[in-house]
């Protein structure tokens, strides 16, 4: 049988052995032609504990890294966007990942203040799945919920006229089924999680 695992939960390692195996595969693929062990940069949430930092470093070392550089995710995201964070001006950056939302103010190449919550993309997907199951008797997998979120999900000003057909399995008959949902309906399904994310940003 096929077992699917999530080695990362909430932005930190939840399955140490799986993350170590995954890192070994990634390093082997990226460093096929290298004679020496590579130096590795790891992105970590800005709110991780010292224990979680050490776990990330240890996993990378066991996977074959020679040296590890830990970069806080908001800094990495800002650099990836081409945002100039070297000036003495505050830049608000919100990173909504899978397991965590990080809200940070960056200035002078550093995180000045930060806040984090464990409500993010995965929680929004689950809210959509729960709504379709409870209100439409339709079971959908996480990839379908993700697609719904990307296609008609919104955080403000939902359009009640915008619609999407969602396919899944009908809970009563067990047969393939579908439902037409509106953007307003999906926004309402995610409302509680969106409020938590907004509170994290304002916090």
Predicted feature locations:
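Nucleotide/phosphate-binding catalytic cleft detector across ATP-hydrolyzing
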Residues: 1-96, 104-203
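Conserved Rossmann-like nucleotide-cofactor binding loop
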Residues: 99
């Amino acid at each position: 049988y096929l077992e699917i695992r999530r080695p990362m939960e909430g932005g930190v390692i939840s399955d140490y052995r799986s993350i170590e195996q995954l890192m070994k595969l990634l390093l082997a693929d990226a460093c096929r032609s290298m004679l020496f062990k590579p130096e590795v940069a790891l992105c970590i949430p800005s709110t991780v504990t010292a224990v979680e930092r050490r776990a990330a470093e240890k996993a990378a070392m066991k996977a074959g890294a020679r040296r590890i550089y830990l970069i806080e995710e908001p800094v990495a995201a800002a650099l990836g966007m081409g945002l100039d964070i070297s000036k003495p001006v505050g830049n608000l950056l919100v990173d909504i990942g899978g397991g965590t939302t990080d809200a940070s103010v960056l200035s002078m190449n550093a995180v000045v203040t930060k806040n984090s919550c464990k409500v993010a993309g995965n929680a929004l997907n689950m809210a959509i799945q729960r709504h379709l199951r409870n209100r439409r008797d339709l079971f959908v997998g996480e990839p379908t919920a993700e697609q719904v979120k990307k296609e008609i999900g919104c955080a403000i000003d939902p359009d009640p006229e915008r619609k999407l057909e969602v396919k899944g399995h009908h809970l009563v008959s067990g047969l393939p089924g579908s439902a037409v949902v509106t953007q307003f309906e999906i926004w309402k399904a995610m409302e509680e999680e969106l409020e938590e994310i907004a509170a994290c940003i304002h916090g």
